[in-house]
């Protein structure tokens, strides 16, 4: 009986070791370099970083801690102000530089010019269109034909403050669309 028990125990141990060697061994995934995928698309964060005319707004986005969000997947619409618009904002509100804007207000400024989960192209807009920004405040876009740029093209005005720059509008990126504007969109509840 003892001999049968040892034989049975030895057989079970052998099966146990053999079984675990199958489950505990790892596979070798040495794939050729051509098999790996490298994303090469441009996200909103890349759009801001790669264009010198958005360097001041890109710094506001960095200070707000939102650059990673603009690098993430999704579908959003961004109205980034050009450097001249940011400089006008700094003068208007008494800031010497972007670094003087409180970080919490930087976050507010970024969210004021962003529509998340919605891609809005200007050619889909009616004469007056209203969207909610990230602060849940209205972005009113008026394209009435009353205001034209130097080339005679009709301008779209956002919140009666900033004009969408016609030469740069509807610029698609992997995670949405950018409509550069002439001024910083400040949050407002009275439109």
Q: PLM features: residue spans?
A:
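Hinge/lid segment of periplasmic solute-binding proteins
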Residues: 52-53
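Aromatic/histidine-rich interaction motifs
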Residues: 99-167, 187, 191
């Amino acid at each position: 009986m003892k001999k049968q028990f040892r034989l049975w125990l030895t057989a079970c141990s052998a099966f146990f070791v053999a079984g675990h060697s199958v489950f505990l061994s790892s596979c070798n995934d040495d794939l050729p370099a051509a098999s790996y995928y490298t994303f090469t698309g441009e996200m909103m964060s890349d759009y801001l970083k790669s264009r010198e005319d958005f360097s001041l707004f890109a710094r506001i986005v960095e200070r707000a801690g939102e650059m990673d969000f603009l690098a993430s997947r999704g579908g959003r619409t961004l109205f980034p102000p050009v450097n001249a618009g940011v400089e006008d904002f700094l003068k208007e509100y008494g800031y010497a530089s972007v670094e003087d804007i409180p970080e919490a207000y930087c976050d507010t400024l970024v969210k004021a010019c962003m529509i998340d989960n919605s891609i809005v192209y200007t050619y889909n807009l009616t004469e007056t269109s209203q969207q909610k920004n990230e602060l849940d405040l209205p972005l009113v876009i008026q394209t009435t034909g009353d205001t034209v740029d130097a080339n005679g093209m009709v301008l779209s005005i956002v919140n009666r403050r900033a004009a969408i720059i016609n030469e740069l509008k509807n610029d698609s990126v992997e995670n949405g669309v950018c409509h550069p504007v002439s001024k910083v969109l400040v949050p407002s509840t009275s439109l």
